[in-house]
From Swiss-Prot:
Translocase keyword on record: yes
Species in which this protein is naturally found: Bacillus cereus (strain ATCC 14579 / DSM 31 / CCUG 7414 / JCM 2152 / NBRC 15305 / NCIMB 9373 / NCTC 2599 / NRRL B-3711)
Subcellular location(s) of the protein: Cell membrane
A GO molecular-function annotation: ATP hydrolysis activity
Enzyme nomenclature, EC number: 7.1.2.2
Protein name: ATP synthase subunit beta
SUPFAM superfamilies registered for this protein in UniProt: C-terminal domain of alpha and beta subunits of F1 ATP synthase (SSF47917), N-terminal domain of alpha and beta subunits of F1 ATP synthase (SSF50615), P-loop containing nucleoside triphosphate hydrolases (SSF52540)
Catalysis performed (reactions): ATP + H2O + 4 H(+)(in) = ADP + phosphate + 5 H(+)(out)
Topology of this chain in the membrane: Peripheral membrane protein
Name of encoding gene: atpD
Primary location group: membrane
Keywords, in A-Z order: ATP synthesis, ATP-binding, Cell membrane, CF(1), Hydrogen ion transport, Ion transport, Membrane, Nucleotide-binding, Translocase, Transport
Assembly and interaction partners: F-type ATPases have 2 components, CF(1) - the catalytic core - and CF(0) - the membrane proton channel. CF(1) has five subunits: alpha(3), beta(3), gamma(1), delta(1), epsilon(1). CF(0) has three main subunits: a(1), b(2) and c(9-12). The alpha and beta chains form an alternating ring which encloses part of the gamma chain. CF(1) is attached to CF(0) by a central stalk formed by the gamma and epsilon chains, while a peripheral stalk is formed by the delta and b chains.
Entries under PROSITE patterns matching the protein: ATPASE_ALPHA_BETA
Family (UniProt): Belongs to the ATPase alpha/beta chains family.
Amino acid sequence: MNKGRVTQIMGPVVDVKFDGGKLPEIYNALTVKQSNENGSMNLTFEVALHLGDDTVRTVAMSSTDGLVRGTEVEDTGKAISVPVGDATLGRVFNVLGDAIDLDGELPADVHRDPIHRQAPAFEELSTKVEILETGIKVVDLLAPYIKGGKIGLFGGAGVGKTVLIQELINNIAQEHGGISVFAGVGERTREGNDLYHEMSDSGVIKKTAMVFGQMNEPPGARQRVALTGLTMAEHFRDEQGQDVLLFIDNIFRFTQAGSEVSALLGRMPSAVGYQPTLATEMGQLQERITSTNKGSITSIQAVYVPADDYTDPAPATTFAHLDATTNLERRLTQMGIYPAVDPLASTSRALSPEIVGEEHYEVARQVQQTLQRYKELQDIIAILGMDELSEEDKLVVHRARRIQFFLSQNFHVAEQFTGQKGSYVPVKNTVSGFKEILEGKYDDLPEDAFRLVGGIEEVIENAKKMMA
């Protein structure tokens, strides 16, 4: 066994000297196992740099409290490896693939894969495009998701990214019954705990593997936990031919963790203090999330937008990799419209007549045109009032407000907070509902009847109650 000794500790970054002249390879896992009067220590490091002839600089995967210079370190000879396959379903893991739930250890013979690997070769990639129905009206109509695509949920703090992810897990697991992998990257432990219990209660957990490296973990764990989840998803895709859903909450924390260790590793910061390797790190992760001839990975990633600034390098780099974006807007939460998805800023490459069909495409574009015109008229309304508008513009405003409210709906996962039953709306019902609103079929119904409902039949029911 190749052994070395700790020579320097800088928080999560540790230097290790190997005297034998044989340095561990980049990405190799090094371990420390020792006992002293303060208890036992079991640490894993990952090699990041070679310094000179005999020293490596490593990043710790857990807290380095209590570690001292001179401690013996062992080279495992391979990268961090995590359990994969059916044994992972229904379980919760940390970045190293250790089970952290209360269901005991995994069987000793469980198969393990290294977390670092190459993206699939060009000729292995699949090119077919198929829509993934989510049951969420605003998403299915205006920025539909692609099976095997990459989807980003963009938004600032507290606008509902995690709730939207939880609803997608619930809807897709209930309706499509596929396997899901959830990677909690640098987010709140409470949310992870809530999600685990909700999924246990609904039975969805049996088809899900969960991996967590939360806010309180050192940056090494937060940077690598997304790769741990991805490795588990890749096994289901490549070895079992499954269509897998990979949820990452939050991909910004992956970048943030990289920037935390970057300066300690001796790299010169680039724009806004981010690591110079930002685009490379993001590319290495994102290129592995793809569909092959064997199966698909559809990934849904929450992207925190610092200070609501979309030009920040972290969200801007993420944009380049996505097939669809769902933008959450604080202005809509203030109006009580949930999910607070911006219908004009959200995009999808699937919104074309060849993929969604002529009718769906036409209805979606008309909805966007109506909302865009309403947005343009809002300044005039604020200054001069509604009465100064032409009859045609009054009708646009009248319908746009109904459309805006009809884009909202109650979520199953928010039932305990709202007391309202959640709704799942099939795409064809969504398209026909908006088509009828655009045609003026419901111009006589009160605006509030359209708020937080599922299908158009609920609107009619609400209107009857209001008029009674």
